Amino acid sequence: MSGAADREAVFPTRQSLGIMKAKLKGAETGHSLLKRKSEALTKRFREITRRIDEAKRKMGRVMQIASLSLAEVTYAVGGNIGYQIQESAKSARFRIRAKQENVSGVLLPAFEAYQAEGNDDFAMTGLGKGGQQVQRCRETYARAVEALVELASLQTAFVILDEVIKVVNRRVNAIEHVIIPRTENTIKYINSELDELDREEFYRLKKVAAKKQRDNAETDAQMKAKKAEQQRLALADSENAEGEQTENTPADILAAEEDEDVIF
């Protein structure tokens, strides 16, 4: 029998046994579902980790090319044109579109960068000289922004999945190592107590049956003894009655004596 610390504090009854069996079945089902959820999330987590590594490598290459392109623009134009671009820009050309992706019940945010149509505030920048370098630099930094948005989306999903996987794994471990063993120990305890009660009940019924047999045997013996006593008394009464009848009958004098033969 398990210790009280390793089982639920329940009263050992048939109803408690049914409740514990239902709880065990629910715990096993929940453990299976959470295990599959953890596996699905872990698979997606590894995929996101691989994509983050690729995105970082891509980001490094793109930023390197963008830096070189900006240096070319500065050299071709003959100075820093950042202030001209800032003065010309009225609204953001790049916009972020957010959506959610459901992965095994977990909502992961996904960001997507797109360019607003008809928004080209600094199209005339570099018209005098360095126009090709400016256009190439703009396209390069556009790819850099898209890479940054993709990396931000992946890293956000990475952080969320990391926390969710930890929570799910804690639940799986709690069910596997705490809830299921405690419930199984409780079921074993209830079964052992019920078996003990059944043995006690069987022993009690056996003792009751033996007592009934002894009582019946004693009753039969008493009835037989009583019947034999009645028969003996009846026989004695019959003998007494016959004796009294014999004493009360008149004696036959003639019959008692034999007649002597007379010889003439």
Curated annotation (Swiss-Prot):
Compositional bias annotation for Acidic residues: 255-264
Bias-annotated ranges (Basic and acidic residues): 214-230
InterPro entries: V_ATPase_D (IPR002699)
Keyword Membrane included in the entry's annotation: yes
UniProt keyword RNA-binding, yes or no: no
Subcellular location field: Vacuole membrane
GO annotation, biological process: vacuolar acidification
GO cellular component, one term: membrane raft
Main location: membrane
Pfam family, one: ATP-synt_D
Record membrane topology: Peripheral membrane protein
One GO MF term attached to the UniProt entry: proton-transporting ATPase activity, rotational mechanism
Ranges for region Disordered: 214-264
Keywords, in A-Z order: Hydrogen ion transport, Ion transport, Membrane, Transport, Vacuole
Family: Belongs to the V-ATPase D subunit family.
NCBIfam families per the UniProt record, alphabetical: V_ATPase_subD
Complexes and interactors: V-ATPase is a heteromultimeric enzyme composed of a peripheral catalytic V1 complex (components A to H) attached to an integral membrane V0 proton pore complex (components: a, c, c', c'', d, e, f and VOA1).
Function per UniProt: Subunit of the V1 complex of vacuolar(H+)-ATPase (V-ATPase), a multisubunit enzyme composed of a peripheral complex (V1) that hydrolyzes ATP and a membrane integral complex (V0) that translocates protons. V-ATPase is responsible for acidifying and maintaining the pH of intracellular compartments.
Protein name as it appears in the record: V-type proton ATPase subunit D
Species this protein is from: Neurospora crassa (strain ATCC 24698 / 74-OR23-1A / CBS 708.71 / DSM 1257 / FGSC 987)
